[in-house]
Amino acid sequence: MTYKPSPRPSYSMPTHIEYNNMKIHKWGDEEAGYVDDWIYISNEKLHQIIFGLKPHSCFKHSKEFRTIFGADELLYILSGIFVISNPETGETHKVLPGDSIFFRKDTWHHGFNVSDEYLQVLEFLSPPPSLGSSGFYAKTKPYI
């Protein structure tokens, strides 16, 4: 599958965003793994999603879907047990529901759901993809 940018929902006024009416964006390919993304807002100021992984599944990276961004990330675990690992350095953290992890731009990361339940993670990315911080930025970095 070829990389294509995710949807960029944006709102000019207070808006009720209903979870049940959201479309799921699928990120990934066979090599990288697949992630479900519920994109709440992604404009020039803010990118906020919930991403999900099936029990005992993971995401890594592939040539098309790289996991290094020109943005800082804050991840808050809603459900499941998340293990995040930097394939470049080997640094690894186990993150439980109610806990968060933060990392700076240019940090490679792989994610693993090591639980029997569906993993959901609240993610904030800054600067947002609309300013060029995600997929196309990742392709400017050396591939590991």
Can you say where each PLM-predicted feature lies in the sequence?
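A short, acidic/glycine-rich surface segment
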Residues: V35-D36, C58-E64
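A short beta-strand-loop-beta hairpin characteristic of the jelly-roll/cupin
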Residues: H61-E64, I68-P97
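Conserved metal-binding segment of the jelly-roll/cupin
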Residues: V95-V114, S126
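A short, N-terminal "cap"/entry segment at the start of jelly-roll beta-barrel domains
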Residues: M1-G52, K139-I144
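Double-stranded beta-helix
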Residues: T2-P7, F112-I144
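Short, charged/polar surface micro-motifs in flexible loops or helix N-caps
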Residues: E44-L46, K54-F59, I81, S130-L131
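Surface loops and adjacent helix of pleckstrin homology
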Residues: F51, P87-T89, V114, F124
